């Protein structure tokens, strides 16, 4: 799950009693940092002057991705800020980020030892763990293998090319029926409310081998738990950047730990059930696949690393979280853009009608024949930039970038929003225009431009579920456009302003949807 532990602290009155206690420590750490000897030929990182205790916190505001983008115009693609007592290097610019995460990938592949990370999956999270490189690589390899092997399994019949396609197609059909029902009774619906349940059902089917009714209390509870997680993490954890605060009572931190424990217990229960009923000759889902990979074997012949049940729980937890919030947020934005740009929606439907028809569902293999749909998705990722930052990185050794010295164990933020809105890369970046990704005749997507869009990270920490996520967004969206026509609700104007948080969502809204006729809406 793409967590952003940036921003940030709310009212600062809680710090008043700590000033005397922490001043000496702050001064010592600042002096130690700024006086560190810079190797010959390298420069000290530029950046704004920090205040005592809080650093540059006040400069970040409620939309740090915008604040840091403005700072990059002044200080360049590599600069340093101070959040509380922790120095943070901020990377912007397509070439700079690719240099760091790909060409110097080993140097920037770490995760910072933030206080809150130890409570995510009980410290065993694949995405957030600060495990040593050998352990992390082995677990990542296992998770990727299980994810890929199960998602590519044959479907239950020839209609589906793989298990993933079957789960998505069936769930989208349920989604269309649910929307049809609510439109008959209410005349409007909240897209996110229905999409998030459908996406959760797909990942439940993949990970746990079960599907829930849309109104099932266990599923609704999971969705609510995820939304609580997004809300509490979106406000940030001050103790990550001001260590003394971890000794003070915090309602937000208490809720954060509580949410993680509840979800951990849910996944642990399912893993226990799978372990008890595991049959090597009948792999039912990703959880079974993980157990199968780990059963009495080592992950890496050279590393002597074995996988415990606890690590399996952590991986399943990560896969569920990552496949849940990111995809549902992307699809919610997609519906918003369809409503906001009816001419584009009409063009997308015509493309699907012409290339696939209306008598069968789109499939993953149809993606190459629907360039406008593919370009539309890329522009959603770019324009919304609903994942404005990657999970924070950390340097694993003393290194340099663009001539600047960066010490080992430095926290690093990757500003994906800046890259996706950089006028050096994109003409008129503030406008929504899927055509920017199409060839002159509109027959294909320019893959080089598509690869510039930052959403799933890069390099050694790139999201392992990226291919599955892209296919899932495509298939959900293509089927919805084929079956439904979305319109703005009279008297309820659509507000596409992003709300900063774990993932950036637009404001919740109601829209109308109707089953399509052969000629369109």
UniProtKB/Swiss-Prot annotation:
Its main location: endoplasmic reticulum. Heme binds at residue 463. Substrate binds at residue 229. It comes from the Eukaryota. The keyword Transferase does not apply. Gene3D superfamilies: Cytochrome P450. It is a peripheral membrane protein. It is found in: Endoplasmic reticulum membrane; Microsome membrane. PROSITE patterns: CYTOCHROME_P450. Disulfide bonds: none annotated. GO terms for cellular component: endoplasmic reticulum membrane; intracellular membrane-bounded organelle. Its EC number is 1.14.14.1. Its cofactor is heme. PANTHER family: CYTOCHROME P450 1A (PTHR24289:SF21), STEROID 17-ALPHA-HYDROXYLASE/17,20 LYASE (PTHR24289). This is Cytochrome P450 1A1. It comes from Oryzias latipes. The lineage of its organism: Eukaryota, Metazoa, Chordata, Craniata, Vertebrata. The gene is cyp1a1.
